[in-house]
A protein has these predicted regions:
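Terminal targeting signals and extreme-terminal segments of soluble enzymes
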Residues: 1-58, 66-124
Length: 124
């Protein structure tokens, strides 16, 4: 069939989210070493056009909200060749400890994410 499986879009959202964190100088390993995880509590995806196996894609990730207890991101997945929107989506993560209790993200991480989100908001 040659069409990308629908679950791959959620993986691409994750890739976009991780890239966003890195852009803010927030890396997964130090968070996990401190016992901070951020499970998905809500996800949505609207499929706009079929992606094909050989398509090169671009994932646009924009912070809708960054608070000390949660992150909400919006995504647009585009085909590089023609700019066609393949999917749009949204995720919400909450910050928890390893036992699943909601926690506040330490300021050393939150401040970096909030600063990048503010820059993004100003650019829109």
């Amino acid at each position: 069939m040659g069409v990308v499986h629908h679950a791959n879009y959620l993986r691409w959202f994750e890739m976009g989210r991780v890239a966003y964190l890195k852009e803010a100088d927030v890396y997964l390993n130090p968070l996990m070493e401190e016992g901070i995880v951020f499970p998905i509590t809500d996800v949505s995806c609207k499929y706009r056009s079929s992606g094909r196996f050989d398509d090169e894609i671009v994932i646009e990730t924009v912070a809708e909200a960054i608070t000390p207890v949660k992150m909400i991101f919006n995504y647009t997945v585009r085909r590089l060749a023609d700019g066609a929107v393949l999917a749009t989506g949204r995720t919400q993560n909450v910050f928890t400890n390893k036992e699943g209790k909601i926690i506040r993200l330490p300021a050393k991480y939150y401040d970096k994410l909030a600063q990048l989100a503010a820059i993004d908001a100003a650019d829109r």
